[in-house]
Amino acid sequence: DLTGRADVVHKLADVGAAIASGSFRTLGMIVAPCSVRTMSEIATGVTSNLLTRAADVVLKERRPLVLMVRETPFHLGHLRTMTALTEMGAIIAPPLPAFYARPGSIEDIVDQSVGRALDLFGLDWSAVRRWDGLKGAPEA
């Protein structure tokens, strides 16, 4: 239950919440998972709920916005939307498995994806298995 772990929980319709304002300080925002609909609303400035409003604020304040887009495959419209968001300063980071880490479970895959997203904020997640190079590879 994630709600029990949160310091504050807002309702999606609560567009008057503090995080809907640029004066509310954050390190940025991670949207995980991010649907194509949410991604599209953020890209076009549609702020129909607190999630898209908060993301819009993060972009306008030039803070990191990481969108872990979940749908695949992508069509050209999705790719153009991702390009537009990247040009606005967002980071598109689909939650893809890092097979070099040899995940043994879904939890391992989730931990690796979360860790990679937190890395973008300079935050350490001990569950991340980091690449340490090829063993026995000749030095250049």
What annotation goes with each model-predicted range?
Residues D1-V66, T72-A140:
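A cross-family phosphate/adenosyl-ligand binding-site feature
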